[in-house]
């Protein structure tokens, strides 16, 4: 059976685990706490592929017709 990367599929946006510095900047920009971010399960196939663990924040960069690209942030939970 051939293994392929989910991230190589055109319908899957770019996912990356944020560093503490990047996260701090985003949280202060939006005046929120980490726990207020939308959630994503650690069992999500993309989380498994990028090696995200509970407590990480994943930055998702999607293509947007109006903005070109738009960033979304998700807190990894159990």
Curated annotation (Swiss-Prot):
The enzyme's E.C. designation: 2.7.7.6
**Role description:** DNA-dependent RNA polymerase (RNAP) catalyzes the transcription of DNA into RNA using the four ribonucleoside triphosphates as substrates.
Similarity comment: Belongs to the archaeal Rpo5/eukaryotic RPB5 RNA polymerase subunit family.
Q: Where in the cell is it found?
A: Cytoplasm
Naturally occurring in which organism (per UniProt): Methanosarcina mazei (strain ATCC BAA-159 / DSM 3647 / Goe1 / Go1 / JCM 11833 / OCM 88)
Q: What GO terms fall under cellular component here?
A: cytoplasm; DNA-directed RNA polymerase complex
Q: Please give the superkingdom of this protein's source.
A: Archaea
Keyword match Nucleotide-binding = no
Catalysed reaction equations from the record: RNA(n) + a ribonucleoside 5'-triphosphate = RNA(n+1) + diphosphate
Name the UniProt record assigns to this protein = DNA-directed RNA polymerase subunit Rpo5
Tell me the SUPFAM superfamilies matching this sequence: RPB5-like RNA polymerase subunit (SSF55287)
Query: What HAMAP family does the annotation carry?
Result: RNApol_Rpo5_RPB5
| Encoding gene (name) | rpo5
């Amino acid at each position: 059976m051939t293994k392929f990367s989910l991230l190589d599929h055109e319908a899957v946006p770019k996912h990356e685990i944020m560093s503490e510095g990047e996260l701090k900047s985003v949280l202060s920009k939006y005046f929120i706490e980490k726990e207020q971010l939308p959630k994503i399960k650690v069992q999500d196939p993309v989380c498994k592929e990028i090696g995200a663990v509970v407590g990480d924040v994943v930055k998702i960069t999607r293509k947007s017709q109006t903005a070109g690209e738009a960033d979304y942030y998700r807190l990894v939970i159990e």
